[in-house]
């Protein structure tokens, strides 16, 4: 049984070797927690989304991201505005300083990815990217319930 879990171990190991040094550096250099940086990164991908949107796409709990957003707004890294169509919704945008931090940090993330993928050929990188996208999309579309249900049925 343990031998069959090598893919999960590999994913976890690579994620740890990628996340730990990068988010540790982000915290030491900018004083931002991982959820706070995830908010900045998410807004770099698409501005005008809600904290709930980021929670759904990132997998972080809503209350964790709510605290992160509040701290980022207070630090003026993120701007929160009321949605014109839905007064209950708050749209999020990068502040000037938040955008600057994102632009300063992204090269390190890219360099780490390049280092991790260096042993792979271009074809292997493309294959890995397609497979990871397929897994991520399935989790995104099925949500946590689908991931938990499929794991429970295989035991």
Language-model segments: residues:
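Residues within helix-turn-helix
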Residues: 51-52, 63, 70, 90
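C-terminal regulatory/oligomerization modules of transcriptional regulators
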Residues: 1, 122-155
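N-terminal leader segment of winged-helix/HTH proteins
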Residues: 1-30, 42, 77, 155
């Amino acid at each position: 049984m343990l031998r069959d879990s090598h893919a999960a171990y590999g994913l976890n190991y690579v994620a740890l070797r990628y996340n730990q040094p990068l988010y540790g550096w982000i915290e030491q250099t900018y004083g931002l927690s991982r959820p706070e940086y995830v908010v900045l990164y998410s807004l770099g991908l698409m501005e005008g989304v809600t904290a709930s949107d980021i929670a759904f796409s990132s997998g972080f709990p809503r209350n964790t991201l709510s605290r992160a957003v509040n701290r980022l707004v207070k630090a003026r890294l993120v701007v929160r505005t009321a949605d014109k169509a839905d007064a209950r919704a708050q749209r999020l945008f990068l502040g000037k300083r938040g955008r600057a931090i994102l632009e300063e940090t992204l090269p390190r993330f890219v360099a780490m990815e390049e280092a991790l993928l260096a042993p792979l050929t271009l074809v292997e990188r493309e294959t890995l990217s397609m497979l990871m996208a397929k897994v991520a999309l399935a989790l995104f579309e099925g949500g946590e319930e689908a991931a938990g249900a499929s794991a429970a049925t295989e035991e």
